[in-house]
């Protein structure tokens, strides 16, 4: 298989529900290789569920996910070897230190111990976690947990990164560092799929994006195509049928 000519991620007819209405309702999506792809949508739109199915963390009721041509469910070993994942609400081994977590992750992936040690050192330094490398993960702040989670996703040098809200709870300095890392990753030929609620972030980082609403893709294309003549936030509100509130009621707040 020529993975270089395959889409970085292809989702075909993904469906998922949890006993009620469809949370993901027939999602089809193609992420070209080498792209910085944004996934946006209102709260509860199905973004996290879609990404969880895309990388094999959640089994779909129907549909397929391929990472560089490898089926996530029928060929998980090859698919998961070339993807790095930062899920929302990542559960980490709480009783390991940051350094131990990276070492454990690398060895579990079958990486050479010397390579694991070298990359662990670099990642801890670049993400400013060196001072906390011997601190238990249970004692990490929300932002530190996000950074160590990103480090585990980067450790094995994947071809595709799938990141669910990677900058949430991260301080501005660390956020800029992470943005630089991701931009360098794409410039070197990697592919990124990133979900976020921050339109300015998506607009500045991504070259392509998809808008999900009520479990369906309502728009997909380049940022310029979806944005049109106005701001991306205006296009987003129009596409999801949102209503900007806050100008009525709550009179008691000023009393």
Residue ranges and their predicted role:
Residues 103, 107, 114-132:
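Conserved ABC ATPase "signature" region
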Residues 157:
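Conserved catalytic motifs of ABC-family nucleotide-binding domains
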Residues 161-165:
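Catalytic Walker B motif of ABC-type/P-loop ATPase nucleotide-binding domains
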Residues 202-204:
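A short, surface-exposed alpha-helical micro-motif characterized by mixed small hydrophobic
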Residues 220-221:
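ABC ATPase "signature
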């Amino acid at each position: 298989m020529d993975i270089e000519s395959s889409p970085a991620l292809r989702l075909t007819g993904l469906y998922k529900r949890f006993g009620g209405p469809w949370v993901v309702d027939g999602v089809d999506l193609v992420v070209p290789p080498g792209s910085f792809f944004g996934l946006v949508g209102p709260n509860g739109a199905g973004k996290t569920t879609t990404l969880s199915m895309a990388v094999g963390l959640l089994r779909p009721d129907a549909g397929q996910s391929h990472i560089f041509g490898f089926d996530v469910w029928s060929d998980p070993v090859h698919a998961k070897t070339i993807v790095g994942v930062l899920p929302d609400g990542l559960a980490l081994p709480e009783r390991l230190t940051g350094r131990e977590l990276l070492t454990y992750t690398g060895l579990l992936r079958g990486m050479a111990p010397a390579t694991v040690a070298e990359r662990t050192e670099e990642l801890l330094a670049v993400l400013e976690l060196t001072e906390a490398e011997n601190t238990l993960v249970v004692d990490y702040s929300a932002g530190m947990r996000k950074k160590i989670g990103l480090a585990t996703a980067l450790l094995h040098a994947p071809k595709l990164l799938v990141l669910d809200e990677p900058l949430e709870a991260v301080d501005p300095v660390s956020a800029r560092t992470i943005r630089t890392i991701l931009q360098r990753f794409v410039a070197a030929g990697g592919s990124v799929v990133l979900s976020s609620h921050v339109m300015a972030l998506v607009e500045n980082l991504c070259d392509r994006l998809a808008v999900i609403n009520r479990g369906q893709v309502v728009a997909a294309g380049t940022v310029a195509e979806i944005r049109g003549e106005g701001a991306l936030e205006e296009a987003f509100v129009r596409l999801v049928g949102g209503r900007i509130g806050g100008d009525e009621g709550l009179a008691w707040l000023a009393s």
